[in-house]
Amino acid sequence: MSEIKNLNPTCIWKNFYALTQVPRPSGHLEKVQQFLLDFAKEAGVEAFKDPADNIVMRKPASPGMEKKKGVILQAHMDMVPQKTPESTHNFETDPIQPWIDGEWVKAKGTTLGADNGLGVAAIMAIMEDKTLKHGPVEALITADEETGMYGANDLPAGELQGDILLNLDSEHWGKFVIGSAGGINITATLDYKEVETDSEDAAVKVTVKGLRGGHSGLEIHEGRGNANKLLVRLVREAIEECEARLASWEGGNMRNAIPFKAEAVLTLPKENVAALKELAQDWLEDFVDEYKGIESGIEVICEDVETPKMEVPEEIQDNLINAIYGCHDGVVRMIPSYPSVVETSSNLAIIEIGGGKSMLKILARSSREDMKDYIVKTLESCFNMAGMKVETAGSYGGWDPNPESEILHLLLKEYKDLFGQDGIIQVDHAGLECSIILGKYPHLDVVSFGPTMKSPHTTTERALIATVEPFWQLLKKALEDIPEK
């Protein structure tokens, strides 16, 4: 694993490897914050943790370059904690195990954390290199981006000093992002009083798994399967045809990841167990056919389990199943003027039912505020009909594109000069912190770019080694050629 430190450019890869050894799942950032502060002290640059738990670093201009515009390099320190079903990894205590697989860097059994660890590693490389030529440089390494962009949302006004912001959280080398979608978290809850299970009933845990999952913004347009939405189809028919009752449900664990696994414990008359298992096999065949060419590993597994003492009341069960069934999931609309770009979507990310409580979590995204409001009200209507309480949180606006951006055209020119190709200007459906930061610092000139990564937020996350070196070359060259104020 340590051979990753020897990849080129070593200044980035050694820092990235060091980051993989520091636990940093969203919500548990104390260790990585201290790691970054210790790094800054060793590098001899000013650094502090701000009231929003972000880490800010400042490096003065190189001699003779003091009049250049100040640049803020921005990335987020947290990572999405996903692991394979068989993994025993503890994200709060264990290091990630990166490894080289041909042209890619991957992780063993978990997310890699290249989103956004490679961006942080590049910032570290800039901060510690005394030979680079640049104007004033700041680093803004934000907290808890993956769970609600809390570090950016709580960023104090007046803290940053720069004129240009380079966000290093994009995942397609050669593409320069100048706009992104806004988003909002929607949580629907319903408490209920459990009822006793029929003492003669059996219980079966039905699991849908083996789906690809993925980033609910960047990959929502691919039509990947959502384990929660597949499972509800099976469960509803089991209730109707096998006299099944719902005892519990658990599906998904991250608001911004497409769920790749969901499971429900059903109780039912013992004589209907065989019919349930046959029904599950029929649904598996349907799912495999539906997702041909998209999902290759779908599994539907039925496992006999101990019969729980309590289950969901029938009326509440039916309301919850209707809510899950009716909840919109996936693309709502493409941008009419850019039909290849998603405008509005929703992701039924997390379902937890059991013990007298139920909760559904959805992340809705849109580049239009009116359409974001539309999908929120659509989902509210669905959940209200089921008697659920609906709350929204973490709303952030979209990042409006500025195709006349001075830093954009500098990057495009230097990309062409360095690599002989034209860069691609892009608007992403993913949420980036740029929109929130621009709301607090509207004078900033902002572009996002980075090396190529695939399948972020999943256990197949990987970084393309060959794109990190040119990314580093462009970043250095851009800092050197930033214009004067």
Please identify what each model-predicted range represents.
Residues E3-E103:
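Acidic/His- and Gly-rich active-site-bordering loop/insert found
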Residues P9-I12, P336, E343-G356, Q421-K477:
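Zn-dependent metallopeptidase/amidohydrolase metal-coordination segment
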Residues Y17-Q21, A264-V265, E299-E311, N347-I351, ...:
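A short beta-alpha structural unit
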Residues M65-P136, I141-T147, A152-D163, N185, ...:
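Active-site metal-coordination/substrate-binding segment of hydrolases
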Residues V137-A227, V235, I239:
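Fold-level recognition of mixed alpha/beta catalytic cores in primary-metabolism enzymes, strongest
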Residues G158, R224-E241, P269-V273, D318-Y325, ...:
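His/Asp/Glu-rich mid-to-C-terminal helical/loop segments that flank catalytic regions of hydrolases
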Residues G179, E196-D201, I220-E250, K270-S345, ...:
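Acidic-enriched catalytic cores of C-N bond-cleaving enzymes acting on peptides and small amides
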Residues N226-N228, R233-W249, P401-L444:
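Active-site-adjacent substrate-binding region
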